[in-house]
Amino acid sequence: MSETVRVQLAPGWQPMTADDLPAGLLRGTQDTVRYIAAAVPQTRAYAPNLVVVRTPLGPDEDPGAVLVGSGRAIVDAIAGVRMIDECPAEHLREGGRLRSGIYILDETALTFMQLAWIQETLSEGACLWTATFTCATREFGAHFGHMYEMSQSLEVVA
């Protein structure tokens, strides 16, 4: 990993490592997950979280098509996801896309907000980056402002 993810975390949020997570949770994703943070819940509950993922593009892949198609990828990856919205996110990231959706996990309704963008470096070429914020749907209103502010501060430094 030749890049660093920087984000100004909201109060009560902290960076996480693979050691902080249940065993096997990141199985098969170790090469793509670049950053994880979560809010420390007051009680045993689903913790609001941020997961930043980097996916290298192949030399024949069209970055624009990959960026737009990445919205479909989250729908295909998580059973029952319903996309609510997807729109350009130029105000957050040049060429970026902002999307939101809902799904149910272990009887808990969850809402996600995802920022996706393409970033190119001389050493790595083009990569798709996604920063996905997720929390219990009933708490989304309370966390949205913090999630949006964190997405504004998010940067990847090579």
Feature map (PLM): residue ranges:
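Conserved polar/disulfide-associated segments of primarily extracytoplasmic proteins
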Residues: 3, 18-128
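Preference for bulky hydrophobic residues occupying beta-strand positions
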Residues: 7, 101-103, 133
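Surface-exposed amphipathic alpha-helical segments
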Residues: 11-13, 129-158
